[in-house]
Design a protein with these regions (language model features):
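Acidic/glycine-enriched connector segments
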Residues: 6-148, 153-177
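Extreme N-terminal basic, low-complexity initiation segments
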Residues: 2-4
Length: 179
């Protein structure tokens, strides 16, 4: 398995019954987060769509603002009903954090950035209203040797209908190791 290793040449991976060609300078990242609506949910959906490993910690009873997090998301309950606990654990369990937001981060997003800095984890912030620089993203991943990427940002209620979709488009673009 090539997870965690930057590739110097195109490699072919067999994942289940699917064959993927991973481009040079990219790797199959593992995505972690807490499964909240908005950015978290888009990140997990993107990871599953791209056949990237994903996991994370979520509050007890799989709490999210819309309902209990569906069982198809591979998350573990963190032993606390407090979202801040899962934020802490996901930050600790990752090599770096990607934050997607608009303007000044709100909700639990500033806590995610604060926890990443506290634990010495590199953080990259992307604006949901801008087209990301894919090469710059992968250069950041390479520079910090990130294998497990925590992805966070606002809940869907922060801007109903305007968080999940742009996040999903951005992540489908930048996380795809075959592009």
């Amino acid at each position: 398995m090539t997870t965690g290793k930057l590739l110097d040449e195109t490699a072919t991976l067999l994942i289940g019954k699917n064959i993927l060609s991973v481009k040079p300078g990219k790797r199959r990242l593992t995505i972690v987060n807490g499964g909240q609506t908005g950015v978290d949910r888009a990140a997990l959906d993107s990871a599953m769509h791209l056949m990237l490993p994903c996991r994370g910690w979520c509050p007890n009873e799989r709490w999210a603002e819309d309902a209990a997090i569906a069982p198809n998301y591979p998350l573990q309950e963190c032993g606390s009903p407090t979202p801040a606990v899962r934020t802490e654990l996901n930050t600790i369990d990752s090599d770096g954090t990607l934050v997607l937001s608009r303007g000044n981060p709100q909700d639990g997003t500033p806590l995610t950035v604060e926890r990443a800095k506290l634990h010495g984890k590199p953080t990259l912030e992307l604006n949901l209203d801008e087209t990301p620089d894919v090469a710059a993203f992968w250069a950041w991943i390479s520079k910090h040797d990130i294998r497990i990427l925590n992805i966070g940002g606002p809940r869907e209620s922060f801007a109903p209908g305007a968080v999940y979709t742009p996040t999903r488009k951005i992540l489908d673009l930048i996380l795809d190791p075959t592009r």
